[in-house]
């Protein structure tokens, strides 16, 4: 199943602005996905920067167009750097996005993520288990893996969006993007996207970058989800497995032409 025509039309419009702006996206992400995240942003036309030292993270967050905080490989020193960057982004009105990886499993990162929410992220992106845990409705999951369907976490996402006044994305076979008042659903993608490390983390970076665009934040974030779903489908069609999927996915993002996809579907 592909994203519907309305979503793809919206995504085509947003992608033009995204590539024209090439948002400078400050990624404080986990060690496992640094390269894949940077390459995903580059393939779409953004400008990634992986600045992680506390001395540099604070001033850089103020000049970037967007900031991503991904707690996948959180340490005490990295938490200090992330907090400094978020405080700087908050003061500079730089939109920042939280990816609360495995927040329902480990207490240190759960408390850290909850503490950061007071600094008003523009967006939160997680799987169902992570969103349920962050909203205080359940604890669990299997590390980075979800034990819940995305739809089951939609009420939690809507409550969290209302509480924080932000966009919340719950990802799965169907992605749900909500600001509590409106909710958009984006089907598509391919199961191969779950057989490599980093597609969710990379999506969070693209969501962060999309928050730098003018216009309706909900539509911009939904467009980011649509781009990734379309690229995942295209890559799967010419891949034999996870090893060939990764380069095919980056190529699909680079060559993504949503208008052409709209014309042929």
UniProtKB/Swiss-Prot annotation:
One of its GO terms (biological process) is thiamine biosynthetic process. InterPro entries: Hyethyz_kinase, Ribokinase-like. CDD domains: THZ_kinase (cd01170). Its cofactor is Mg(2+). Pfam families: HK. Substrate binds at residues 50, 198. ATP binds at residues 125, 171. Gene3D superfamilies: 3.40.1190.20. Keywords: ATP-binding, Kinase, Magnesium, Metal-binding, Nucleotide-binding, Thiamine biosynthesis, Transferase. One of its GO terms (molecular function) is hydroxyethylthiazole kinase activity. The keyword Transcription regulation does not apply. The keyword Transmembrane helix does not apply. Its EC number is 2.7.1.50. It catalyses: 5-(2-hydroxyethyl)-4-methylthiazole + ATP = 4-methyl-5-(2-phosphooxyethyl)-thiazole + ADP + H(+). Pathway: Cofactor biosynthesis; thiamine diphosphate biosynthesis; 4-methyl-5-(2-phosphoethyl)-thiazole from 5-(2-hydroxyethyl)-4-methylthiazole: step 1/1. Belongs to the Thz kinase family. Catalyzes the phosphorylation of the hydroxyl group of 4-methyl-5-beta-hydroxyethylthiazole (THZ). This is Hydroxyethylthiazole kinase. It comes from Salmonella paratyphi A (strain AKU_12601). The gene is thiM.
